[in-house]
Amino acid sequence: MSKMEPYVRPSRLLRPDGSPDNNDRVEIGPTQLAFNEWRELGLTAPNLEAMRHYRLDRIVQQLQAQDLAGILLFDPLNIRYATDTTNMQVWITHNHARACFVSADGYMVLWDFHNCDHLSAHLPLVKEVRSGASFFYFETGDKTAEHAAHFAQEIDELLQSHAGSNRRLAIDKIEIAGLWSIEALGIEVSDGQRVMEHARVIKSLDEINAMRCSIAATEAAMHLMRDASQPGVTENDIWA
């Protein structure tokens, strides 16, 4: 992972996965070594831009089919599916400091941890990056209800802007203070996990290519670990 200045002009050259061939950026993903190995195996790298558009379209289709105004996501895996962003995945699984809102018209807002805007600077589908989705006791203490109420007001404003009179919002997982604050504004909450699981049901060709490449990389790593596992060798030596 390298550092990206947000005002650097994007490179016109593309890598096999459709990403700009510019190392002066923050973006998770494979290196040239992986691209070379996949090519030798006869595998096709996924086009990440196309995959991101496909996933957003799948979410929007589910929202429209269920007459939902939008969906609010806190599960880091669901946020990754919707935005292709990641940040402190394990910590965020326990402490919901990130969130994502997707409206039925495809407008996407990401709440990231403070000072982390650069992590999504390369993603044009993320229309806004905000902070302030933290309303759990470890972070906000006795002011949790206050923080939750402020966040709920932001959601209410987004619904009014993008859904008019539709007050039906899907949520996957949320801290109880946030749920209370959202429902107090007259917003009807429904199951967001159902929406996301149905969105994932049909895979695109790029998603299938991504899985094939991921499996190949994992299998290669496991073979290396197996070959390095010898009597008297420590786990640290194997990982190294």
Tell me the role of every PLM-derived stretch:
Residues 1-220:
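A composition/biophysics-driven feature that prefers long, compositionally simple stretches
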Residues 215-225, 235-238:
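Active-site pocket-lining segments that scaffold enzyme catalytic pockets across diverse folds
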Residues 48-52, 230-240:
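Signal-transducing coiled-coil linker helices
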